């Protein structure tokens, strides 16, 4: 279910402050965050945000097509190991 249009999109306060500081200084540096639930807003465009995937921080460059999506969508948490084998030689 999507968020109500009456509410503003969720963005973590510390992440929002970091982006506003970089925008006022007109600097570009990697922003490290654990907030995967934050929504990408237009002020984030052009920044590189390192999103935590549970093990490490993955750098993601924010473009205009990402606006409205969550940060966690761009940092996968699971690695696919392959389907289970049914062959008898792979069993013990």
UniProtKB/Swiss-Prot annotation:
Xref: SUPFAM superfamilies: Ribosomal protein S19
Compartments reported by the entry: Plastid, Chloroplast
InterPro entries (alphabetical): Ribosomal_uS19 (IPR002222), Ribosomal_uS19_bac-type (IPR005732), Ribosomal_uS19_CS (IPR020934), Ribosomal_uS19_SF (IPR023575)
Listed GO CC annotations: chloroplast; mitochondrial small ribosomal subunit
PANTHER family in UniProt: RIBOSOMAL PROTEIN S19P FAMILY MEMBER, SMALL RIBOSOMAL SUBUNIT PROTEIN US19M
Protein family (similarity comment): Belongs to the universal ribosomal protein uS19 family.
Protein name in the entry: Small ribosomal subunit protein uS19c
């Amino acid at each position: 279910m999507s968020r109500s249009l009456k509410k503003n999109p969720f963005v973590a306060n510390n992440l929002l402050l970091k982006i506003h500081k970089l925008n006022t200084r007109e600097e570009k540096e990697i922003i490290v965050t654990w907030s995967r639930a934050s929504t990408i807003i237009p002020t984030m465009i052009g920044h590189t945000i390192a999103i935590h995937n549970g093990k490490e921080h993955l750098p993601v460059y924010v473009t205009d097509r990402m606006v409205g999506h969550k940060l966690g969508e761009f940092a996968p948490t699971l690695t696919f190991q392959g389907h289970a084998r049914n062959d008898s030689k792979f069993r013990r």
